[in-house]
């Protein structure tokens, strides 16, 4: 991507927010990466100069770089002020947008970026927002030659690129994949900032509009290759992982399906069926999550119920979500494993009448998901936009990570930065 006309290659919008501060630290690390062959001019953006300055000072102290504050630009802008967003976008090649919930605050940033020739990356896990933005802005972004790429954090780069990695490693045709997410915690347990909780509340409370949006898009069904992937029960036992699992409620399924549609329609690649699950351990954890899920699904249906869920996240999530977010000790001790079980056909075997005769197991492993892996994924996606333009879709547009980055070296970048892709096993049946 052309960067020479703009003062900043990256502008981190929402840098003083809970997730934004971690993204800021990650860009600061990337700035001094010994493998960098060129300088990385960048800035932070938000409503308060004081807060932005404090974030830079905190990052400088943590990274041992006392001059960091003087090396990074500061841009004052506000979601409520479109002119200020325009000024920010004019100065950036890529805007990593950390301001959510995106259903409320994401569209003005996308609009400003498209109108002013900047690309934009977000870390939304909200299917309605992601799908609506593609419907509304894909052609406009393509006309401007800019890239708008959603869900470029833990939701949903590991899942989306994990399916592509699995397909690339199979010696044949991959037809179906199930993924199982396992979150590992240390002795102090897990905690997630309530911004993620709020996004889930608004998303579940607005399921009817998501269905209307999908019905209005009038998309033709993607061909079914191989046997139809059977859905598991809401609570099922995974023999391979020796634990119970539930359907994963994030954006992964929506994102992966959109990617597979793009790869089929634009690159003539065989579409892969996909289902996502999360492991929950033993029966005690299952019972605890059942109660939490029932509470959530009951209260999220009503306006006053949603207000209570938002006001008391720790209580209704059984301690998983809080307004304070995780401590540094909790972050340092946490990690994730995303395991993929795929099936398909060896070369020369027809997919219409025969049963799948190849199985493959792959994994994506990484550090704490929300505030370590997400910034790594977001920043490396941004660096891929800047440095691997020849392997991006030729025209701009609104893309999923897999659609945008399937031909790039993003997986190699992630491997070098601690999000590791590997093959566990592969065999003919």
UniProtKB/Swiss-Prot annotation:
The modification N-acetylalanine is found at residue 2. This is Saccharopine dehydrogenase-like oxidoreductase. It comes from the Eukaryota. The keyword Acetylation applies. It is an enzyme of class 1 (oxidoreductase). Belongs to the saccharopine dehydrogenase family. The modification Phosphoserine is found at residue 217. InterPro entries: NAD(P)-bd_dom_sf, Saccharopine_DH-like_oxidrdct, Sacchrp_dh_NADP-bd. Keywords: Acetylation, Oxidoreductase, Phosphoprotein. GO terms for biological process: glycolipid biosynthetic process. PANTHER family: SACCHAROPINE DEHYDROGENASE-LIKE OXIDOREDUCTASE. The gene is SCCPDH. It comes from Pongo abelii (Sumatran orangutan). One of its GO terms (cellular component) is mitochondrion. GO terms for molecular function: oxidoreductase activity. It holds the Pfam family Sacchrp_dh_NADP. Its EC number is 1.-.-.-.
């Amino acid at each position: 991507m052309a960067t020479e006309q703009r003062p900043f290659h990256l502008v981190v919008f929402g840098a003083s927010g809970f997730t934004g501060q971690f993204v800021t630290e990650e860009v600061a690390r990337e700035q001094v990466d010994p493998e960098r062959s060129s300088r990385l001019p960048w800035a932070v953006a938000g409503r308060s100069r004081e807060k932005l300055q404090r974030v830079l000072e905190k990052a400088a102290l943590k990274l041992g770089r006392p001059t960091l504050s003087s090396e990074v630009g500061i841009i004052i802008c506000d979601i409520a002020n479109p002119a200020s967003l325009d000024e920010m976008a004019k100065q950036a090649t890529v805007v990593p947008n950390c301001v959510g919930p995106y259903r409320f605050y994401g569209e003005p940033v996308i609009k400003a970026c498209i109108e002013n020739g900047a690309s934009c990356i977000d870390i939304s896990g909200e299917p309605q927002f992601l799908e609506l933005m593609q419907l509304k802005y894909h052609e406009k972004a393509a006309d401007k030659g800019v890239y708008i790429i959603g869900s470029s954090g833990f939701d949903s780069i590991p899942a989306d690129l994990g399916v592509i990695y699995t397909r690339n490693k199979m010696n044949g045709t991959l037809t179906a994949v199930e993924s199982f997410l396992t979150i590992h915690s240390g002795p102090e347990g897990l905690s997630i900032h309530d911004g993620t909780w709020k996004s889930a509340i608004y998303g579940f409370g607005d399921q009817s509009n998501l269905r209307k949006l999908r019905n209005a898009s009038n998309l033709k069904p993607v061909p079914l290759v191989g046997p139809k992937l059977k859905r598991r029960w809401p609570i099922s036992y995974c023999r391979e992982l020796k634990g119970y699992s539930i359907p994963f409620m994030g954006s992964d399924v929506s994102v992966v399906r959109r990617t597979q549609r793009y790869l089929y329609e634009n690159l003539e690649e065989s579409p892969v069926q996909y289902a996502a699950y999360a492991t929950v351990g033993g029966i005690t954890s299952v019972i605890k999550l059942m109660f939490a899920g029932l509470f959530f699904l009951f209260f999220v249906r009503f306006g006053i119920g949603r207000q209570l869920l938002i006001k008391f996240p720790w209580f209704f999530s059984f301690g998983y979500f809080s307004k304070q977010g995780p401590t540094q000790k909790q972050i340092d001790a946490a990690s994730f494993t995303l395991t993929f079980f795929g099936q398909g056909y060896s070369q020369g075997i027809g997919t219409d009448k025969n049963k799948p005769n190849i199985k493959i197991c792959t994994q994506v492993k990484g550090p704490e998901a929300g505030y370590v892996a997400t910034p790594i994924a977001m920043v490396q996606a941004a660096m891929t936009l800047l440095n691997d333009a020849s392997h991006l879709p030729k025209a701009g547009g609104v893309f999923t990570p897999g659609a945008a980055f399937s031909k790039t070296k993003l997986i190699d970048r992630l491997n070098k930065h601690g999000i590791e892709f590997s093959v566990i096993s592969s065999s003919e049946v």
